[in-house]
Amino acid sequence: MSKKITSIKRYLSQKELPLYEDLFNQLDEVSNVLENEDVIYRPLNSNNERGSLLDLKEDIPIIIVPDIHSRPDFILNILDYELPFDFLKNKTKICDVGEFENQKNLPQKMKIGNLLEKELVYLVCVGDAIHSELTPKRWASIEDEFYSGIYDGPVMQEEMIAGFAVLCGIMELKRAFPKNFHFLKGNHENILNSSENGDYAFKKYADEGEMVKKFVQTVYGDDILYLISYFEANL
């Protein structure tokens, strides 16, 4: 397993909240990547900034990942999923595969993580990194904490450990494979819980949008809150 994939899996498998300094640096670095993406695959918008449109020109498979919602295991399983090599053969020149130039030595299957490293697939997530949808009872318990004035209670920490595992894993994927990994902005990429500039404050099982905002402010402060919002704005 490569160092890049190992690092990504480490973030996705974290069972504690990330440290302030680590999170700050990761947000700063991934925002720099997003701000400087190649206009060949991410054309400029009317404001002369990287827009939200992707122009994926390479004739390779595009794997579309649906809403993630605080499921780090979902991404881990995708990276480890083995695709039959025949799936790629019609769209990939054998010489692009490096060590598999001899067609007789082609593997039967390859993991998506390995294909991503070799730039043989695109992996495109359609957004919604945080706010678990599988734990309505947990959100009810978080609501009890929240309206008691506890914004970083143990139940909310459990929710946010999973959420930050996803967020950090996504950022590491983007840093590692900027050309072939893309994460689009969904309606849940709204850490400020704003209802301006095309965003809408989010509620489903509880007041999740405000609860997450207050958690980040309480645990990490306004600097991290701003950096997350800046990362979201650059998606």
Residue ranges and their predicted role:
Residues 1-235:
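Feature recognizes metal-dependent phosphohydrolase scaffolds
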